[in-house]
UniProtKB/Swiss-Prot annotation:
GO cellular component: extracellular space; Golgi apparatus; Golgi cisterna membrane; Golgi membrane; membrane; plasma membrane
MF term (GO), any: galactoside 2-alpha-L-fucosyltransferase activity
Location of this chain's protein in the cell: Golgi apparatus, Golgi stack membrane
Top-level division of the source organism's lineage: Eukaryota
Effect of residue 164 to H: Found in individuals with para-Bombay phenotype
Catalysed reaction, written as an equation: a beta-D-galactosyl-(1->4)-N-acetyl-beta-D-glucosaminyl derivative + GDP-beta-L-fucose = an alpha-L-Fuc-(1->2)-beta-D-Gal-(1->4)-beta-D-GlcNAc derivative + GDP + H(+); a ganglioside GA1 + GDP-beta-L-fucose = a ganglioside Fuc-GA1 + GDP + H(+); a beta-D-Gal-(1->3)-beta-D-GlcNAc-(1->3)-beta-D-Gal-(1->4)-beta-D-Glc-(1<->1')-Cer(d18:1(4E)) + GDP-beta-L-fucose = alpha-L-fucosyl-(1->2)- beta-D-galactosyl-(1->3)-N-acetyl-beta-D-glucosaminyl-(1->3)-beta-D-galactosyl-(1->4)-beta-D-glucosyl-(1<->1')-N-acylsphing-4-enine + GDP + H(+); a neolactoside nLc4Cer(d18:1(4E)) + GDP-beta-L-fucose = a neolactoside IV(2)-alpha-Fuc-nLc4Cer(d18:1(4E)) + GDP + H(+)
Name of the protein this chain belongs to: Galactoside alpha-(1,2)-fucosyltransferase 1
Result for mutant: residue 242 to R: Found in individuals with Bombay phenotype
Length: 365
């Protein structure tokens, strides 16, 4: 009798131990490496295993206290979405932000391709994981060309494997996630510190005082000098526009300093009025390393932009007041079929109309 009771007691103790281990693993399984096989112990618990292979590259850390550079997607998300990394620096920022926003809106997991990671990760603390090329090539994608403003159909995309394309850079896609977008596009410390060091050395020309208000000025030139008039019946920002924009800030802010960056710095030095001693040409204009100029602009208090996504993102991240070039194409421009000003510029930004007279001159026989 005693032996039987002792045996039953041992079996009961063993059963309690096994159940305790199962309960512990069930509660704490997120602390173990992803993919730990608990399905045998907990058959009702299905592991969410993505139908893709990913790899994380340097620069995708979630934060200074993150223990892993590979962010974990919430279990409620499914599918795999990505975006073609087309265009230059500002274009790819727009594609990244739009992918992130649309994927969240539709309950999908977002991944970026290696080329986008190579363009953005050296500059920002981005967190989206990277899709392996071999998985990209094997995935049965449906491709979707986006236009540059949010549409109702984009809120109900049911494709589990979707590859976005186009050049979206409209606040209407992602402005409801502004703080998250700003975190994604947080500069690495060394870039921020370098930009702040440059700004800290600036002095007002007439008094030698430290400026208290910095206005970043981005002047887009380069290929736009031909593309805008020849293809889009448009203009780029001229000296008259820049003078009006600077005067707008001078009237509203005490002793601002204008920090000019451009991919046409020689033109800027010859055409921007510096007689008031409040203009400095601080950018290096190197299109191969745009993040230096970009970092400078984002560390300013306010922004003057001409045209282009580079200037948009500098203004969006800097915050403060923004003045932009408005109505820079003729009314019959094909550009207006793919570009909506009300979706491109935030409502609180201030537009100054472009001078279109050079285009009317070209149009005359």
């Amino acid at each position: 009798m005693w032996l039987r009771s002792h045996r039953q007691l041992c079996l009961a103790f063993l059963l309690v131990c096994v159940l305790s281990v199962i309960f512990f693993l069930h509660i704490h399984q997120d602390s173990f490496p992803h993919g730990l096989g608990l399905s045998i112990l907990c058959p009702d618990r299905r592991l969410v295993t993505p139908p893709v292979a990913i790899f994380c590259l340097p620069g995708t850390a979630m934060g200074p206290n993150a223990s892993s550079s590979c962010p974990q997607h919430p279990a409620s998300l499914s599918g795999t979405w990505t975006v073609y990394p087309n265009g230059r620096f500002g274009n790819q920022m727009g594609q990244y932000a739009t992918l992130l926003a649309l994927a969240q809106l539709n309950g999908r997991r977002a991944f970026i391709l290696p080329a986008m990671h190579a363009a953005l990760a050296p500059v920002f603390r981005i967190t989206l994981p990277v899709l392996a090329p071999e998985v990209d090539s094997r995935t049965p994608w449906r491709e979707l060309q986006l236009h540059d403003w949010m549409s109702e159909e984009y809120a109900d995309l049911r494709d589990p494997f979707l590859k976005l394309s186009g050049f979206p850079c409209s606040w209407t896609f992602f402005h409801h996630l502004r703080e998250q977008i700003r975190r994604e596009f947080t500069l690495h410390d060394h870039l921020r510190e370098e930009a702040q060091s440059v700004l800290g050395q600036l002095r007002l020309g007439r008094t030698g005082d430290r400026p208290r208000t910095f206005v970043g000025v981005h002047v887009r030139r380069g290929d736009y000098l031909q593309v805008m008039p020849q293809r889009w019946k448009g203009v780029v920002g001229d000296s008259a526009y820049l003078r009006q924009a600077m005067d707008w800030f001078r009237a509203r802010h005490e002793a601002p300093v204008f920090v000019v960056t451009s991919n046409g710095m020689e033109w800027c030095k010859e055409n921007i009025d510096t007689s008031q001693g409040d203009v400095t040409f601080a950018g290096d204009g190197q299109e191969a390393t745009p993040w230096k100029d970009f970092a400078l602009l984002t560390q300013c208090n306010h922004t003057i932009m001409t045209i282009g996504t580079f200037g948009f993102w500098a203004a969006y991240l800097a915050g403060g007041d923004t003045v932009y070039l408005a109505n820079f194409t003729l009314p019959d421009s094909e550009f207006l079929k793919i570009f909506k000003p009300e979706a491109a510029f935030l409502p609180e930004w201030v537009g100054i109309n472009a001078d279109l007279s050079p285009l009317w001159t070209l149009a005359k026989p």
